[in-house]
């Protein structure tokens, strides 16, 4: 019997009553019989953004298989048609091999293409929404396959219209890419490459540097970690909390609670809606949660390389992960009156 601990990058979670792997087409054929009253159905990708309860899951978990990516001309763009089960990083690597560099800043992000669309991934100045063509979705309420455009996805920070929605399943989608190099739009990446912002660099240069940055933070899947880098922090869901957005008034109160000058441009950023995005990692550190912190006797800990990652040090349970995450959210809330929102999807759990 398959368990969530076997199919998630965090490596926690109980047994699954029924586990199915199938292609998107096979899923559409079988779906009406799966989505029946009283039966729980969960469709997963790479399990890199999922935390499941230790209790047995009584329903069906479906993992969609990948299929070949189809590349075709579409006017000024080249259209990549991709199945939901395709590894995101494999897609990045494949697009680079074909001379399309736009996805290179998002190298090394674990999980699948379907998860990337639902999660609205972005990294180092690039975002999946900026190149989205369409999303193919199975609607369990109507048993039909429908197409979502960019507006239909209602993208927000690390969220979309399809995140945490169990009756709509992403089957695949299209990205519209242009060949050639892409400008470096993120300060940390520019500094690492030793170039000015806006400089055009080859996708391979960008990819190599992004993978190195992620390895230094312990934010790469184990199979992508370059030789010589630590792999002890790879059992995680990446960043466990999203960076909170606060009002400018709240930011003024926050300044009085932290050391003078601490709220600099490296930890705050103006949001496109007029709020201020604050580094969640900064809030954890200012609340006393240092890298490597753990509750006594627990195998769940904060990564020794990145303050925002909760890692499984070996044999951790979902209960231990939630215990640590709960302690963090309560402490940050008491100290700064800021509620941290978890980034991963919870199954049978809540903070």
From Swiss-Prot:
Q: What is the lineage of its organism?
A: Bacteria, Bacillati, Actinomycetota, Actinomycetes, Micrococcales
Pfam families from the entry?
FAD_binding_4, MurB_C
Question: Would you tell me the Gene Ontology cellular component terms?
Answer: cytosol
Q: Any idea what this protein is called?
A: UDP-N-acetylenolpyruvoylglucosamine reductase
Q: Which reaction does it catalyse?
A: UDP-N-acetyl-alpha-D-muramate + NADP(+) = UDP-N-acetyl-3-O-(1-carboxyvinyl)-alpha-D-glucosamine + NADPH + H(+)
Task: Name the GO terms of the biological process aspect.
Answer: cell division; cell wall organization; peptidoglycan biosynthetic process; regulation of cell shape
Q: Which InterPro entries match?
A: FAD-bd_PCMH, FAD-bd_PCMH-like_sf, FAD-bd_PCMH_sub1, FAD-bd_PCMH_sub2, MurB, MurB_C, MurB_C_sf, Oxid_FAD_bind_N
Write one Gene Ontology MF term.
FAD binding
Subcellular location, in the record's words? Cytoplasm
Q: Which UniProt keywords apply?
A: Cell cycle, Cell division, Cell shape, Cell wall biogenesis/degradation, Cytoplasm, FAD, Flavoprotein, NADP, Oxidoreductase, Peptidoglycan synthesis
Tell me where in this chain the FAD-binding PCMH-type domain is found. Answer: 11-213
What cofactor is needed? FAD
Organism of derivation: Tropheryma whipplei (strain Twist) (Whipple's bacillus)
Q: In which pathway does it act?
A: Cell wall biogenesis; peptidoglycan biosynthesis
Question: What is the active site of this protein?
Answer: 158, 239 (proton donor), 343
What functional role does this protein have? Cell wall formation.
Signal peptide start and end residues: none
Q: Give the UniProt family note.
A: Belongs to the MurB family.
């Amino acid at each position: 019997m398959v368990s969530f601990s076997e199919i998630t990058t965090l490596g926690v979670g109980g047994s699954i009553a029924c586990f199915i792997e199938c292609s998107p087409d096979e899923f559409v054929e079988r779906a009406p019989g799966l989505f029946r009253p009283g039966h729980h159905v969960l469709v997963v990708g790479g399990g890199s953004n999922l935390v499941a309860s230790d209790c047995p899951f009584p329903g069906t978990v479906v993992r969609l298989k990948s299929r070949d990516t189809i590349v075709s001309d579409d006017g000024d763009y080249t259209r990549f048609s991709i199945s939901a089960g395709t590894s995101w990083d494999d897609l990045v690597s494949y697009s680079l091999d074909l001379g399309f560099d736009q996805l290179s800043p998002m190298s090394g992000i674990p999980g699948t293409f379907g998860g990337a669309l639902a999660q609205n991934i972005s990294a180092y100045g690039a975002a999946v929404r900026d190149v989205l063509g369409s999303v193919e979705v199975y609607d369990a309420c109507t048993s039909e396959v429908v197409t979502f455009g960019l507006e239909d996805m209602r993208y927000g920070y690390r969220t979309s219209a399809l995140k945490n929605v169990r009756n709509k399943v992403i089957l695949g989608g299209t990205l519209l890419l242009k060949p050639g190099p892409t400008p470096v739009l993120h300060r940390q990446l520019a500094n690492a490459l030793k170039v000015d912002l806006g400089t055009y660099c080859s996708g391979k240069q960008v990819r190599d540097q992004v993978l190195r940055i992620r390895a230094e933070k312990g934010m790469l899947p184990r199979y992508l970690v370059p030789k010589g880098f630590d792999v002890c922090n790879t059992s995680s869901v990446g960043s466990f909390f999203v960076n909170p957005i606060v009002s400018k008034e709240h930011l003024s109160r926050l300044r009085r609670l932290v050391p003078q000058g601490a709220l600099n441009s490296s930890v705050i950023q103006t949001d496109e809606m007029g709020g201020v995005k604050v580094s969640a990692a900064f809030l954890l550190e200012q609340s006393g949660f240092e890298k490597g912190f753990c509750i006594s006797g627990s195998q769940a800990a904060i990564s020794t390389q990145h303050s925002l990652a909760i890692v499984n040090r070996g044999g951790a349970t979902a209960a231990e992960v939630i215990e640590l995450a709960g302690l963090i959210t309560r402490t940050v809330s008491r100290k700064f009156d800021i509620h941290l929102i978890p980034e991963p999807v919870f199954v049978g759990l809540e903070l």
